[in-house]
Design a protein with these regions (language model features):
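A short beta-strand submotif of the Rossmann-like class I SAM-dependent methyltransferase core
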Residues: 107-110
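C-terminal lobe and adjacent flexible extensions of AdoMet/dcAdoMet transferase-like proteins
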Residues: 217-285
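A short glycine-rich, Lys/Arg-flanked "PGG" loop and its adjoining helix->strand segment in the class I
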Residues: 121-133
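Class I SAM-dependent methyltransferase SAM/SAH-binding core
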Residues: 52-95
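Class I SAM-dependent methyltransferase "Motif I" SAM/SAH-binding loop
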Residues: 45-47
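SAM-dependent methyltransferase
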Residues: 138-228
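A short acidic, Gly/Pro-enriched loop at the edge of an enzyme's catalytic core
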Residues: 97-105
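Conserved class I S-adenosyl-L-methionine
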Residues: 1-39, 50
Length: 285
């Protein structure tokens, strides 16, 4: 089985840590969810701490987990600068093996990254096992049908023109040390039969208009239907599924760009407990 293919390393991780630092409507949405569903919580795919840091600043008990040690290193640096302390775990979602059990696990924009359906299924099962009874697993998924380029790239004539050329130009952003960084991406291939797209990202680092470093990473993206994700959640043991749109309380419709899935751990699947569960969530013998 292949490992997840993602691109959150090196210069790309540095870009995310420098410029992708502000949360949008998802910030308040997941904050309210944690306050309602309970703590401790786990930010699955926490990246450089875009959501994790403000949640900690709000006084919530939230751990972080990410597959990329590069981006977790940036998250640690940001936490230290702000005087914040939490647990950060460098693990893949499908291999989740943490010492705590959570009342809330949420995943922002990471379901489908890696391009392997079986890994996503395993990740859901691992999330189920890491929840306390009645715990909540929530994630958002950006639909492809409202993204014309992504949708059209499935057509035979579009697939034949792949891989795309790199964009001829890109905006450079200035880093604190005076260097400039730019990111561009392109589609390499699409497979409508497997519902997978393969994309590349190129990061370039400039100093006084001289290119001093270039990195290229490849990422596979799974595409799912709403019903497929529901079936996967149910197979993992989740029940009481709710699906909302665009980080609101509106029931999801075809006009929404982001679907938010909220699922509860099914008590009927629980075996007789073999571990004491203290209030802080740590499993002890």
């Amino acid at each position: 089985m292949r490992e997840p293919q993602i691109w959150h390393y090196g210069l790309v991780a540095r870009y995310w840590g420098a410029f992708e630092t502000e949360g949008g409507p998802e910030m308040e949405y997941y904050k309210r969810l944690i306050e309602t569903s309970g703590q401790p919580a786990l930010d699955l795919g926490c990246g450089s701490g875009r959501l994790l840091i403000p949640l900690l600043q709000a006084g919530l008990d939230v751990d972080g987990c990410d597959y990329s040690e590069d981006i977790l290193g940036i998250c640690r640096e940001r936490l230290e600068k702000k005087g914040l302390i939490t647990h950060l775990y460098p693990q893949a979602m499908h291999e989740l093996d943490l010492p705590r059990r959570y009342r809330t696990i949420f995943a922002r924009g990471v379901i489908g990254l890696g391009g392997e359906h079986r890994l996503t299924m395993q990740a859901m099962q691992r999330c189920y096992e890491h929840l306390r009874p009645n715990g909540i697993f929530a994630f958002d998924y950006m639909v492809r049908w409202n993204d014309p380029p992504a949708w059209m790239s499935r057509l035979p004539e579009k697939r034949q023109s792949l891989p795309q050329d790199w964009p001829s130009s890109a905006e450079r952003k200035c880093l604190p040390d005076g260097t400039e960084i730019e990111l561009v991406s392109r589609t390499i291939s699409t497979d409508p039969l497997e519902n997978v797209a393969t994309r590349q990202i190129r990061a370039r680092l400039w100093k006084e208009d001289e290119l001093i470093k270039e990195e290229i990473y490849t990422q596979r993206l799974d595409d799912y239907s709403k019903n497929e994700l529901v079936l996967m959640l149910e197979k993992a043991g989740f029940r009481d599924l709710q699906i909302y749109g665009d980080f609101t309380d509106e029931v999801a419709t075809p006009d929404h760009n982001d679907l938010i899935f909220i699922a509860k751990k099914n008590l009927k699947k629980l075996l007789r407990p073999t571990h004491k569960m203290p209030d802080d969530g740590y499993v002890s013998g």
